[in-house]
A protein has these predicted regions:
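Generic N-terminal amphipathic, Lys/Arg-enriched alpha-helix
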Residues: 8-20, 47
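A short beta-strand-loop structural module common to alpha/beta enzyme folds
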Residues: 41-53
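Short coil/turn connectors at secondary-structure junctions
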Residues: 10-14, 40, 81-84, 111-112, ...
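Glycine-rich phosphate/diphosphate-binding loop of Rossmann-like nucleotide-binding domains
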Residues: 16-38, 161-246
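Glycine-rich phosphate-binding loop
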Residues: 74-94, 239-288
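N-terminal glycine-rich phosphate/adenylate-binding segment common to multiple enzyme folds
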Residues: 55-168, 179, 269-271
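Buried hydrophobic positions in well-ordered alpha/beta secondary-structure cores of metabolic enzymes
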Residues: 21-24, 83, 140, 196, ...
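Short acidic loop-to-helix transition motifs that present clustered carboxylates
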Residues: 50-52, 123-124, 245-252
Length: 288
């Protein structure tokens, strides 16, 4: 995942690189070899984050200390002071008390709302799932909201049962209850959808698909669908067609007819799943 924060043009750029955990060190080593061979005007600055920093901070401050984190203050400072940041891979573990994902923190702290996920066939790379070798899909995944907003409850406060009548059937006989809020905002929908259309306009692409489940999840996905259709009208003058469809149908059609897709915009969770699927059509996540 790349986090680009490019400022005004200058002779040399300061770039923070973060290897993360485990395989991330191998990935970053290879990436730096390639980038340094290009003789780019870059001053490199190393920073750390991920599970390794969680363990290190626990040893330093003690388990349960609020200062324990996957993203240390010096890493945040490095990102703020440099022009761009590249990051490899990190480890996130479930069920660890006090643990906060480094990726989610970075996305929310710096408001990195666009997760741009391309999937394009490359010469010499086999793609057994797709009959048509000419796949060129760019997915705009909203990156800060939805179920990944990290608004969760466990154990569930009793007053939560009174918020919605749909909770009545969970009051008794269900055992423990956990809830994750699916948070959508008008601003969040508007800016990711407009970014997708602006990209299509700038690159000469003629379709933008919005993948949702507004037929079932009527409030959150209903909001995204409504805003998408409103914005789509603005781009008809540029010959760009906005197409909205159910996300589960998209999952099927990506396998059957991937060449029908050019630009896709989706909410955080659907975009996460569909972009991984699309990447496999072109050889795997390593090629996306």
């Amino acid at each position: 995942e790349n986090i680009m924060r490019v400022k005004a043009k200058k002779d040399r750029y300061d770039v923070t690189y973060m290897a993360g955990d485990d395989s991330g060190f191998d990935m970053m080593e290879g990436a730096l070899l390639v980038l340094e061979s290009l003789d780019l005007p870059i001053n490199w600055r190393r920073a750390d984050l991920g599970w390794c920093m969680w363990e290190k901070s626990n040893k330093k401050f003690g388990e349960g200390d609020p200062r324990c984190n996957t993203v240390p203050p010096e890493t945040i400072k490095a990102i703020e002071e440099t022009d761009a940041t590249i990051m490899a891979a990190i480890t996130s573990k479930a069920g660890v008390k006090g643990f906060k994902s480094a990726i989610l923190q970075m996305r929310q702290l710096f408001d990195l709302y666009i997760n741009l996920r391309p999937a394009k066939t490359l010469p010499g790379i086999g793609t057994p799932l797709a009959k048509n070798p000419d796949i060129d899909i760019v997915m705009f995944r909203e990156n800060t909201e939805d179920l990944y907003a990290a608004v969760e409850f466990f154990p569930l406060p009793k007053e939560m049962f009174d918020l919605h009548k749909g909770m009545d059937r969970f009051r008794e006989g269900k055992g423990e209850i956990a809830v994750s809020w699916r948070v959508f905002s008008e601003e969040g929908c508007m800016r990711i959808i407009r970014a997708a259309f602006e990209y299509a306009k700038a690159t000469g692409r003629k379709t933008v698909h919005c993948c949702n489940k507004a037929n079932v999840i009527r409030q959150t996905d209903g909001m995204m669908k409504r805003i998408f259709l409103e914005i789509a009208k603005e781009y008809e003058q540029y010959g760009i067609k906005g197409i909205e469809e159910n996300a589960d149908a998209t999952a099927m059609w990506l396998i059957k007819n991937p060449q029908d897709y050019s630009v896709i915009v989706a909410s955080n969770v659907f975009g996460d799943i569909l972009s991984d699927e699309a990447s496999q059509l072109t050889g795997g996540l390593g090629f996306a």
